[in-house]
Curated annotation (Swiss-Prot):
Localization: Cytoplasm
Top-level lineage group: Bacteria
Span of domain Response regulatory: 6-123
Catalytic reaction annotation: [protein]-L-glutamate 5-O-methyl ester + H2O = L-glutamyl-[protein] + methanol + H(+); L-glutaminyl-[protein] + H2O = L-glutamyl-[protein] + NH4(+)
Protein name according to UniProt: Protein-glutamate methylesterase/protein-glutamine glutaminase
Biological processes per GO annotation: chemotaxis
Source species of the chain: Moorella thermoacetica (strain ATCC 39073 / JCM 9320)
PANTHER family: PROTEIN-GLUTAMATE METHYLESTERASE/PROTEIN-GLUTAMINE GLUTAMINASE, PROTEIN-GLUTAMATE METHYLESTERASE_PROTEIN-GLUTAMINE GLUTAMINASE 1
Length: 424
């Protein structure tokens, strides 16, 4: 891409416009090409100035942030970073903005907050957003509706059959039977050995996109890389960062409410935003989704999202595995919550019964945890580059040779179901 990054600052507050402009202009890799005081001005200036990134306020006269974002994505897609408030209402609006196509967000500094932290985050996020290809930004009809075609209807009832994910019990059994020896959920003998030709250890499977046949074929081919006799998967651990809320929505809304495995999730977010994200995902998914609390017990059909500002760790007590929330994780990490911190305890408590999923995000958080999962005999799925908003965390896993499957986002939920239900 071309440097410096051209940025349009959109905010009705003169103070906020000046603060953001001064911070960005101090970086030689960033050029503020203009500002707008409301959404209508923003649409006009995006068309005339052609910025690469827009910083967008939520509450403005004439046209608010969400309305502006929707119009931008439908007509003139550009990387958008939302400047959000710390209020509960502001957090809910931010979650909606991420669904509608915003690349990332940053809370406006409150009195007493460190301007150094805000400066660092703002410049880092602007540069990261500038690297996102325009083809990955939400656009047109897909953005206005912004509802991925689910394999099941949103919240049809938490007893929805697992077979609905792939269309029929026979289809689910067919996928599962091709993953490992033994019996599939439908009682058929597995045939993994017959379909594993061409797969070598250390080489991730990369299927074609979009068709059930491609998904089934990829998962079946992946059996050649997986241990021949795996115990049933009991936990799905998901880690993500930039682009994660939209990715989580697509994955979780395509899973059945009675998935026979618990789910634990780390999404890098500041305090005050993980709760609203969990509530929004719970509204949309057939699974039960909630922000994790200390003492929560993992169970099938429940997805627990790590709270911001804490490390979510797992501890086994007898037959139950519980959530432990800690200030520190006993490892060196920049993040709270940390994907590595969670995944390391997943590997410890579940071993070969664990499935690690790494989605879009900056950096390499999760790499140590995925390595531990693999060393304990677990399985790893990584999102592919073409569908990742930022191909950092998945890339680290793929380049380290840890990914059993490298899949486009829309194929990850079917693969999870196939692996979980076909591993018995």
């Amino acid at each position: 891409m071309n440097w410096p990054v051209r940025v349009l600052v959109v905010d009705d507050s003169a103070f906020s416009r000046r603060l953001v402009t001064d911070i960005l202009q101090a970086d030689p890799d960033i050029q503020v090409v203009g500002y707008a005081r409301n959404g209508r001005e923003a649409l006009e200036k995006v068309a005339s100035l052609q910025p690469r990134v827009v910083t967008l306020d939520q509450e403005m006269p004439v046209m608010d942030g969400l309305t502006t974002l929707t119009a931008l994505m439908a007509g003139n897609p550009v990387a958008v970073i939302m400047l959000s408030s710390h209020t509960a209402a502001g957090a809910a609006v931010t979650i909606k903005a991420l669904e509608l196509g915003a690349v990332d967000f940053i809370p406006k500094p409150a009195p007493g907050d460190s301007l150094d932290d805000f400066t660092r985050q703002l410049t880092e996020k602007v540069k990261a957003a500038a690297r996102v290809p325009v083809t990955r930004l939400c656009r047109g009809k897909n953005c206005r509706e912004n509802t991925p075609a689910p394999f099941i209807s949103p919240r049809p009832g938490r007893e929805e059959a697992v077979a609905a994910v792939t269309g029929s019990a026979a289809a689910t059994a067919a996928i599962g039977s091709r993953l490992s020896p033994g019996r599939s959920p439908g009682g058929k003998e597995g045939v993994a050995g017959a379909v594993s030709a061409g797969s070598t250890r250390g080489e991730a499977i990369r299927p074609g996109k979009g068709t059930p046949a491609a998904i089934k074929g990829a998962v079946a081919a992946g059996a050649g890389r997986l241990p021949g006799r795996r115990p049933g998967i009991e936990v799905v651990a998901i880690g993500t960062s930039t682009g994660g809320p939209a990715a989580l929505r697509q994955v979780l809304t395509a899973l059945p409410g009675n998935l026979p495995a618990g789910i634990v999730i780390v999404q890098h977010m500041p305090a005050g935003f993980t709760g609203p994200l969990a509530r929004r995902l719970d509204e949309l998914a057939a699974l039960e989704v909630r922000e994790a609390a200390a003492g929560d017990i993992l169970r099938p059909g429940l997805a627990l999202l790590a709270p911001a500002g804490r490390q979510m760790l797992l501890e086994r007590h007898g037959d139950a595995v519980q959530v432990h929330l800690a200030a520190e994780a006993g490892i060196t990490t920049l993040f709270k919550p940390s994907v590595d911190a969670l995944f390391l305890t997943v590997a410890r408590e579940y071993g070969p019964r664990s499935l690690g999923v790494i989605l879009t995000g900056m950096g390499n958080d999760g790499l140590r945890g995925l390595r531990a999962i693999k060393e304990q005999g677990g399985t790893v799925i990584a999102q592919d580059e073409a569908t990742s908003v930022v191909y950092g965390m998945p890339r680290a896993a793929v380049e380290a040779g840890l990914a059993d499957l490298v899949l486009p986002l829309e194929d990850i939920a079917p693969a999870i179901v196939a692996l979980v239900t076909g591993a018995g």
